[in-house]
Amino acid sequence: MAYRKLGRLAGHRKMMLRNIVTSLLKHGKIETTELRAKELKSLAEKMITLGKRGDLHSRRQALAYLLDEDVVTKLFKEIGPRYADKNGGYTRIVKTGFRQGDGAPMVLIELV
């Protein structure tokens, strides 16, 4: 499976992505770099698909990946049912410009 390394070791990269997915589902939108957002998009869509399924096994898979139990509850009670009739495309990436310090391309990723 292809993925982006994001300039980090495997454990650091996985934990960073878990943190970002948890934040996105908690707040509905976040601003991050373009490469992180592209990697985040597929993970967030997988989590929302688990929320749509709504069974016990899906809930346990989400609990194993997400870092906050309140976010898992929100995923299964609010976010999953909101996208019950939609097949994919739950997130949107909007370019917002470049970061002041290093010129990295920044984007806003949000739930549609």
From Swiss-Prot:
Protein name (record): Large ribosomal subunit protein bL17
Listed InterPro entries: Ribosomal_bL17 (IPR000456), Ribosomal_bL17_CS (IPR047859), Ribosomal_bL17_sf (IPR036373)
Subunit structure: Part of the 50S ribosomal subunit. Contacts protein L32.
Keywords from the UniProt entry: Ribonucleoprotein, Ribosomal protein
GO biological process, one term: translation
Family: Belongs to the bacterial ribosomal protein bL17 family.
Gene that this polypeptide is encoded by: rplQ
Domain of life: Bacteria
Keyword Lipoprotein: no
Keyword Disulfide bond applies: no
Pfam families: Ribosomal_L17 (PF01196)
